[in-house]
């Protein structure tokens, strides 16, 4: 791509939480950002925050588990902002339950959004990266990839993201495309609030209990994850690929 051309990123699940923080950070880093979530209207706050700071952004609605919607979303970003060469696969859902209570539908939905969604988004976006001979793919995993009670579906999906990432690094490296996975620990989001509700704890007590188990003595914020992704999405991270980086405030074992 021309030296002075603005890089374009797509961040999925970017209406709120980690995705919104990542979209804003990449925009602050100078990228135009496709802000993608299930409903384009839900992305308005993120887009407005980026534009108010002088950045360029586009709200895009798509179900990442549906191939036709994914292709249309990537095409829209390429048309309106330019060919995407940075992709952050962050979209995710929870359907927590103990294994014997978990329905096949809950299993399929979680793996569909996390794994199928990352596969479809990457397949659509990598074409632009190959053409540019440059790309950055960052897949959101989780500390739950190591196993977590009540999250058989989510843990399997997040572990799968790590294997998917390493394979992408091997297949796409020849095109100067890197692929890395970021695995957050406890981050204050709607998802962790939902987990607190599932175990019948107030979110404040849940955070306090978690902080006692974390080496740095606090829970994480979405911006902690965004800082890490900012580096992995940068030109300076061209020799970092196929890695899983835990953003968890300390070792997990």
Annotated model-derived regions:
Residues 40-41, 61-72, 104, 223-224:
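The beta1-alpha1 cofactor-binding region of Rossmann-like NAD(H)/NADP(H)-dependent oxidoreductases
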């Amino acid at each position: 791509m021309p030296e002075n051309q603005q890089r374009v990123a797509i961040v999925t699940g970017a209406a709120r939480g980690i995705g919104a923080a990542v979209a804003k950070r990449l925009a602050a880093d100078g990228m135009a950002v496709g802000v993608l979530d299930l409903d384009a209207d839900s992305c308005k706050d993120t887009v407005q925050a980026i534009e108010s700071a002088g950045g360029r952004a586009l709200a895009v609605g798509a179900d990442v588990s549906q191939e036709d919607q994914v292709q249309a979303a990537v095409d829209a970003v390429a048309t309106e902002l330019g060919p995407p060469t940075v992709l952050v696969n962050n979209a995710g859902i929870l359907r927590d339950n103990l294994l014997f209570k978990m329905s096949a539908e809950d299993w399929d939905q979680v793996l569909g959004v996390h794994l199928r969604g990352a596969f479809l988004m990457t397949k659509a976006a990598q074409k632009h990266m190959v053409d540019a001979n440059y790309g950055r793919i960052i897949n959101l995993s989780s500390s739950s990839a190591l196993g977590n009670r009540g999250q058989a579906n989510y843990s399997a999906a997040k572990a799968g993201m790590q294997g998917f990432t390493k394979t992408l690094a091997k297949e796409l490296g020849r095109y100067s495309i890197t692929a890395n996975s970021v695995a957050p620990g406890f981050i204050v989001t709607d998802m962790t609030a939902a987990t607190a509700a599932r175990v019948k704890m107030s979110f404040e007590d849940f955070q306090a209990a978690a902080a006692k188990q974390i080496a740095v003595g606090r829970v994480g914020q979405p911006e902690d994850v965004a800082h890490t992704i900012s580096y992995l999405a940068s030109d300076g991270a061209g020799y970092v690929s196929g890695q899983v980086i835990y953003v968890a405030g300390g070792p997990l074992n």
